[in-house]
């Protein structure tokens, strides 16, 4: 679990997850980069899947020591008051311990380059972005896509609940053109260097 920040001046942030075996990448738009916002995403996912299925999917979560992840007890405790996950922290200055998510962030930044504000994004846009990223074949999966591997591992209902869909690999777009901008707000998407 990690966060990807918007341009300076924007409070919106993406909370991201990476399933290491399947290489499946998820992202959820948050209005602020706070522990409360992270908990809200986890609560919504737990309600969507139910506590047992949430625990099955998110049994262990590895993250960094960002302030938004600073109270593991709060994040580990579910909406029913029972423990829903186990939070573990990377060692300081060891981003390689969660290298898979960093590689997924690199793909995300191909679509949403640094200095891009997320103020214009909707969760629908984020789901489209993650669907394209997860439909990109990976060498580490013997040329298969994370979507297809996750479909076998988790089933179609889980991928639908994550609001992911399969994109034909020939139609995958990993550029800013993927998100169609409103021309009126286009000038507000990036900040000058």
Model segments located where?
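Conserved small/polar residues in nucleotide/adenosyl-binding loops
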Residues: 186-193
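Short, surface-exposed connector motifs at secondary-structure boundaries
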Residues: 22-26, 52-59, 112
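Active-site beta-loop-alpha junctions of metal-dependent nucleic acid enzymes
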Residues: 6-10, 27-52
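Acidic/histidine-rich, metal-coordinating catalytic segments
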Residues: 54-71, 91-93
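An active-site-proximal beta-strand-loop segment
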Residues: 1-26
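Charged alpha-helix within mobile-element recombinases
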Residues: 77-78, 84-178
